[in-house]
Amino acid sequence: MAIGTGDQAPRENYPAWVRNDLERDYYDTEWGVPVTDERGMLERVCLEGFQSGLSWYTVLVKRPAFRELFANFVPDALVKFTNDDVERLLQDERIIRNRLKIQATISNALLTIELRDRAAAGDTSLAGFYLPNGQWVEPGLPAFIW
């Protein structure tokens, strides 16, 4: 499949799941790139949770609204969300509306802060678990997210 827009020459070597410009941009700029900052890691973990049972394209389309409604996945802001916030989010059609996934996002923010506190006390945080130079994955094997 060849994909290209504007001045960009079409590429033939995209994976089969890349079917449109949004997925192409994601593949070219984010796929396989390690996420090393706290906010980015929290966003990725939470969006992967929302994606469960759905396509990643669905999440990509809704990601701007997720960022807006979930305080840009800043953990210190997310942990302040209340039951009223959960109810408000359940009414917003711009995101995937699943009570358990919304509640898990708030819980993940709390756990992120706990990891940060552990790191300040000498423990490692999630950033200590990614491979700094990446890892080559043989063709046909699944890729790592981190």
Question: PLM features: what roles do these ranges have?
Answer:
Residues 1-146:
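HhH-family (HhH-GPD) DNA N-glycosylase catalytic core used in base-excision repair
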